[in-house]
């Protein structure tokens, strides 16, 4: 079963194994045209409910348990970019949310070496501590569907700034929304594995740190979250107990 303390190579191997079998299972359950059919269904619901707004829509939930003992809950998600009245724009990305003793979200990716043209697995991990702080500072219940909705609404995959912690170790800073930041570190045993460890909003930041990131905040405000936030795909969530409030 997936555990955040698992060595990076074993962690990526297990996620990759589950990813392949989960994709096969979804195709078996929903048919070979699942993406095409779901795009049409989501487009119809989306245009009816949020034709003039920029929001994400979460659809039905499916549960899958892998042979490795991981339980995944799958959500359909769509978002409309600003200025596109009835057009959905997205890329095929998957997020894996797992809880087996702890809660976490996974974004498996592939990194291509430009010199050798070989692919290497990489993974962005949102840890349990991040979600605890995210729920606490957003004043929403931990391990709830409301927290999932809030997390999905504020996802931002692009690390806008590299910084250092108090010990001089490199960290990555993600702008989650207009008032909050997520802080991540690269694993020492594998720099392609990034752990997002905590969340801070501006009320929890010192004046010096807030001033330090004013330029970042202004950049996000100017960008309008256009870069890596518009996407369409399945969100896969794993949980050992109840299915996030269902």
Model-derived features: where do they sit?
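Ribonuclease/tRNase effector modules and their secretory precursors
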Residues: 1-246
């Amino acid at each position: 079963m997936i555990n955040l303390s698992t060595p990076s190579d074993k962690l990526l191997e297990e996620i990759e194994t589950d990813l392949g079998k989960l994709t096969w299972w979804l195709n078996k359950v929903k048919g070979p045209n699942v993406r095409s059919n779901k795009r049409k269904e989501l487009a119809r619901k989306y245009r009816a409910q949020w034709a003039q707004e920029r929001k994400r829509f979460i659809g039905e939930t499916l549960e899958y348990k892998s042979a490795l003992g991981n339980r995944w809950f799958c959500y359909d998600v769509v978002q409309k970019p600003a200025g596109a009245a009835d057009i959905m724009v997205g890329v095929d990305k998957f997020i894996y949310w797992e809880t087996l003793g702890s809660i976490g979200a996974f974004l498996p990716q592939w990194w291509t070496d430009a010199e050798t043209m070989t692919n290497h697995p990489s993974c962005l991990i949102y840890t349990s501590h991040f979600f605890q702080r995210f729920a606490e500072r957003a004043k929403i219940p931990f391990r709830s569907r409301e927290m999932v909705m809030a997390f999905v609404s504020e996802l931002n995959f692009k690390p806008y700034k590299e910084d250092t912690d108090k010990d001089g170790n490199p960290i990555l800073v993600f702008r989650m929304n207009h008032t909050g930041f997520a802080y991540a570190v690269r694993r020492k045993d594998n720099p392609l594995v990034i752990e997002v460890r905590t969340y801070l909003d501006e009320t929890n930041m010192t004046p010096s740190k807030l001033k330090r990131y004013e330029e970042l905040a202004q950049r996000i405000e100017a960008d309008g979250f256009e870069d890596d936030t518009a996407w369409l795909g399945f969100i896969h969530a794993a949980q050992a107990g109840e299915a996030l409030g269902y």
